[in-house]
Amino acid sequence: MAKLTKRMRVIRDKVDATKQYDITEAVALLKELATAKFVESVDVAVNLGIDARKSDQNVRGATVLPNGTGRSVRVAVFAQGPNAEAAKAAGAELVGMEDLADQIKKGEMNFDVVIASPDAMRVVGQLGQILGPRGLMPNPKVGTVTPNVAEAVKNAKAGQVRYRNDKNGIIHTTIGKVDFESDKLKENLEALLVALKKAKPSQAKGVYIKKVSLSTTMGAGVAIDQSGLTAVAN
């Protein structure tokens, strides 16, 4: 058996794996256990009551967190004409068409989000094998293929998170940084859960939000008592 590190022993002693924590208590615990030399992200895992094997029960979308994610996001936009100018004005770092595609083909990937206007998809389509595996391919379901590229850029900069269930029906995303105030993390979590409830597939039966867990980048997961979450209770 692998030897437990000092950090792992502290986590084991502090976190009760059988307990569901009130959100405020959970955040306080995560802050206490976040001892990395960088500001760790607070990540959430939401187990959904869906059959992920069925395409009509998959959950995918995006929402803007009210308090952002604490991350600086670089945005690339495929657009031309007035849309290109609007994207630049909204703060996009990279804007172009074939010239931007050529940069990406050369391996220049200095961005976190890719947005495209519908008329630019003829150019973006040829980049599927590069952008797809990295989760960067623009998609109308998450608002990254849109005629209003300026709004999409502003959303990305404001702390929009994209979500998509994995093969086990679990959503993984971030809701901020461990140095956020507890209330801000709770507000972000509530906003995500509201978005997930709105995205509930009509074919999903039974309990939809089955489990909510929070963790930091380097820490253990803490199960959340859903009775204290307005988004779940309502």
Swiss-Prot record:
Pfam families hit by this protein: Ribosomal_L1
GO CC aspect terms: cytosolic large ribosomal subunit
Gene3D superfamilies for the chain: 3.30.190.20, 3.40.50.790
GO terms assigned for molecular function: rRNA binding; structural constituent of ribosome; tRNA binding
Stored CDD domains: Ribosomal_L1
NCBIfam families attached to this UniProt entry: rplA_bact
Function: Binds directly to 23S rRNA. The L1 stalk is quite mobile in the ribosome, and is involved in E site tRNA release. Protein L1 is also a translational repressor protein, it controls the translation of the L11 operon by binding to its mRNA.
Oligomer status and interactors: Part of the 50S ribosomal subunit.
Protein name per its UniProtKB record: Large ribosomal subunit protein uL1
Name of the coding gene: rplA
